Amino acid sequence: MPNFSYEDSFSHGSNAIVVGVDEVGYGSIAGPVVAAAVYIPDRNVECIPNIKDSKLLTPKKRDALYKELLSHTVCGTGLASIDEIEEHNILVASHMAMRRALENLNLQRIDLVLVDGSRELKSQWPSKSIINGDELSISIAAASIVAKVTRDNMMRELHDQYPEYHWNKNCGYGTAAHILALKQHGATPLHRKTFAPVKKCIISTKNQDK
C-alpha cells in the first residue's frame, strides 16, 4: 500500500507542502492526456482510506474515493490536447498536462512535487521522480485516482459524439473493438494520428482508395 514514506524522505520538516502528480491516457490512441496534482493537508487520510494506484481499484471504489479526494484534499487537473500530443510527443504533452495541473492547485506555495515515472518534470517547483510512484507514494496514488476518473468521465462524454468507437468502455485505449471500429469507420479528429495503430489504419485506408 502506498504511504507517506517518500513524502517524508524527500521533504524537509512536517510542514512541507508535498504534492503528488500523475497522468492518465499516455498509451491511449484517442483523446487527451490528463494529469492531476493532489496535496493531502495534515496528511489526513482517515476520510480517504485504502488509497492505492487507480489501476488496482474497481470503478465503483475509484469513483467513491474520487469524491472523497475532492472534498478532503487540494486537487488540480490539467490536460494536453490531441494537437499538442501530435505537435510534440506524448512525453512532452504529459509533462505539459502535469504543469497545468500544478498551476491549477489553489496553494500559495509548493515545496516539493513527487512525480510518477522515471523522467524529470521541468517546472518552477522542485520535483522528484519515482518509478511506480502510484504504488509507493500516497500523494501520487491519490493523483492517479483523480486523473483517471477525470479522464474517464471526459471520454464518456466524447463517446456521445463518436459512439461507434465505444469510448465509454475503452476510454480511448486500443482494444480489439476500438481497432475494429477504427478500420471500419476511419480516424476521427480525436484520434492520435502519429500513434502506430491509428497511423496504420490511415495508411491502409489510403491504399484501398488508390
Curated annotation (Swiss-Prot):
Q: Required co-factor?
A: Mn(2+); Mg(2+)
Cofactor binding summary note? Manganese or magnesium. Binds 1 divalent metal ion per monomer in the absence of substrate. May bind a second metal ion after substrate binding.
Record-linked Gene3D superfamilies? Ribonuclease H-like superfamily/Ribonuclease H
Q: Which residues form the RNase H type-2 domain?
A: 16-207
Tell me what this protein is called: Ribonuclease HII
TM helices/strands, residue ranges = none
One BP annotation, GO: mismatch repair
Q: What is the protein's species of origin?
A: Anaplasma phagocytophilum (strain HZ)
